[in-house]
């Protein structure tokens, strides 16, 4: 075949890994779909319910009322089976919707309505069991099984309070089988802690020898995988701030369920929970939402506030750096910078190849943001590339891309081998904060190193930046190029209005109702405004981006300097 085999054309070392995973998957699927496997999962039937795990995430009663009225609204899409309709026997609007539906993340919204919601939750759970109680690759796959086990375990007592004896037996038996299947899944380190936690929550909820054995096995697994999932400084190994919040919620739920059973939580659990609580504190910005990097969303304020309620040291000052991120703060400005490489290998399924990206808040409101991509957003994989972040790019090149085709189907949409290195150095003084960052993601293709310097003046209350492209290649460019174009992007929050000044070098950024705003000035050759999109709570919102364009001579390099300052304290450009 021209161009080599399919395996030869796959990117990097991921080819061999993808082939191995695909070869192992088919026999495994045949086993889990067999009668013998169903009997294996059914061993050690639970005798009843023990703990009542409490999911500490806030519920949305209005969403529960929509379900009672006959409509599931998930991820911005709607399925309307009607009152007491069956959502399981009809096609979902999209695969993404089906994932959210089968995860049962909507169950807390129903239970927030009391007995009426619990009755509907019981009916929907039994309908699911009749349709999907036997294994299939989608509804019993790890993408949905992990969250469904957690959600059903937390809902079990409320549902069973209205169940007949036969329905009660069905619910606890299904929960036990699903949790046992969850412990069988071995897809590498990514989400291993989340799977073990969900299985342990189910084990804590189930009474009798079957529940106790399930709990013991899940806790053994959790003790083993937690150190790899939570970094020593408290971040999630994926470098996704939202992942840290979600795992903190799950571990807090498990800690509470173990306490109900009179059991002491393992030291590994308590230590990880303490470190994750510190990460939640670090990533919570002035608007009460999260910094949105590496596949994490900013989330709703109430959601983040609920996570912070679990932090016994919430009043402690947060460190200036954590998990590869830096925070810089003055009176009115708050800056977060991504100063590390994306997570490697299996941890990168939600990672973004966007080195040195920043987010900026002005007076507690988002001003400069990233694209806001997340695995649950209705966004293209292109939103994980460098152009979708507030950083610099050269030509039309990417610093890394998600796997595609066969490799993506086998391994998930992890980033292809990321070879670039990121360096950072920070200095602090009474009058200002300096952060110097650099990465060599453009070195192989262009012979250039991107260096970004940030200075936040504490007294002046302004942010100064310099993006420099420094040559690292002593020989001529192999392609014979002398110049290549570069772009420095600033994606704006969808609530920000932008206007280019008459000098064509400055852009006025204003929030609605703000009389002054902020000037973004630069010495770029060309300054333009172009359309952009920002994903918030998983939904696209049209916005704009400021582009600073120029040309870099490969033998000499180039730089562009810019400054963000309050329009209330600065003269307007002429």
Language-model regions, residue ranges each:
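Residues that flank catalytic or metal-binding motifs in active/ligand-binding sites
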Residues: 102, 324, 356, 388, ...
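Aromatic-lined, polymer-binding surfaces characteristic
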Residues: 94-273
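CBM-like, beta-strand-rich accessory domains located in the C-terminal region of large
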Residues: 2-6, 146, 381-574
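Short strand-coil-strand connectors
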Residues: 75, 329-333, 363, 395, ...
């Amino acid at each position: 075949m021209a161009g080599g085999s399919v395996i030869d054309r796959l990117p990097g070392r991921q080819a061999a890994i993808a082939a191995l995973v695909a070869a192992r998957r088919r026999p495994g699927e045949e086993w889990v779909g067999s009668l013998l496997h169903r009997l294996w999962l059914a061993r050690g039937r639970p005798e009843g319910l023990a703990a009542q795990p409490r999911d500490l995430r806030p519920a949305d009663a209005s969403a529960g009322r929509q379900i009672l009225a006959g409509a599931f609204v998930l991820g911005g899409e709607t399925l309307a089976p009607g009152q007491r309709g069956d959502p399981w026997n009809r096609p979902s609007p999209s695969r993404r919707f089906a994932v959210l539906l089968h995860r049962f993340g909507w169950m807390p919204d129903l239970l927030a309505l009391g007995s009426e919601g619990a009755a509907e939750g019981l009916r929907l759970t039994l309908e699911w069991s009749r349709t999907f109680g036997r294994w299939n690759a989608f509804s019993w796959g790890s993408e949905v099984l992990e969250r469904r086990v957690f959600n059903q375990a937390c809902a079990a007592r409320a549902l069973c309070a209205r169940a007949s004896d036969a329905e009660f037996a069905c619910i606890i038996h299904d929960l036990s089988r699903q949790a046992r299947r969850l412990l069988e899944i071995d897809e590498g380190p990514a989400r291993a802690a989340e799977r073990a936690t969900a299985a342990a929550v189910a084990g804590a909820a189930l009474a009798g020898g079957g529940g106790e054995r399930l709990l013991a096995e899940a806790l053994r697994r959790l003790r083993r995988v937690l150190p790899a999932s939570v970094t020593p400084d408290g971040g999630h190994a994926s470098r996704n701030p939202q992942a840290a919040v979600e795992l903190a919620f799950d571990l807090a739920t498990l800690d509470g369920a173990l306490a109900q059973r009179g059991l002491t939580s393992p030291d590994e659990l308590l230590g990880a929970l303490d470190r994750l609580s510190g990460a939640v504190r670090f990533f919570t910005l002035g608007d009460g939402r999260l910094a949105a990097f590496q596949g994490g969303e900013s989330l709703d304020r109430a959601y983040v506030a609920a996570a912070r309620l679990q932090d016994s040291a919430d009043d402690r000052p947060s460190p200036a750096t954590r998990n590869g991120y830096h925070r810089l703060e003055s009176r009115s400005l708050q800056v977060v910078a991504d100063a590390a490489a994306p997570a490697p290998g299996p941890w990168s399924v939600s990672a973004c190849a966007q080195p040195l990206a920043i987010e900026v808040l002005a007076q507690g409101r988002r001003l400069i943001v990233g694209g806001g991509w997340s695995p649950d957003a209705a966004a293209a994989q292109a939103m994980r590339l460098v152009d979708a972040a507030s950083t610099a790019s050269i030509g039309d090149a990417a610093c890394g891309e998600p796997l595609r085709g066969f490799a993506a189907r086998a391994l998930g949409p992890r980033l292809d081998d990321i070879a670039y290195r990121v360096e950072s150095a920070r200095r602090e003084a009474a009058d200002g904060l300096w952060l110097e960052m650099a990465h060599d993601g453009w070195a192989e293709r262009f012979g250039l190193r991107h260096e970004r310097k940030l200075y936040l003046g504490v007294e002046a209350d302004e942010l100064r930046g310099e993006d420099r492209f420094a040559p690292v290649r002593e020989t001529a460019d192999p392609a014979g190029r002398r110049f290549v174009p570069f772009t420095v992007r600033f994606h704006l929050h969808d609530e920000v209005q932008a206007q280019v000044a008459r000098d064509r070098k400055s852009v006025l950024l204003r929030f609605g109702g703000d009389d002054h705003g902020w000037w973004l000035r630069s010495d770029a050759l060309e300054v333009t405004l172009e359309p952009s999109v920002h994903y918030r709570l998983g939904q696209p919102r049209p916005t704009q981006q400021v582009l600073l364009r120029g040309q870099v001579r490969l033998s000499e390099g180039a730089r562009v300097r810019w400054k963000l300052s309050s329009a209330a304290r600065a003269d307007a450009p002429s």
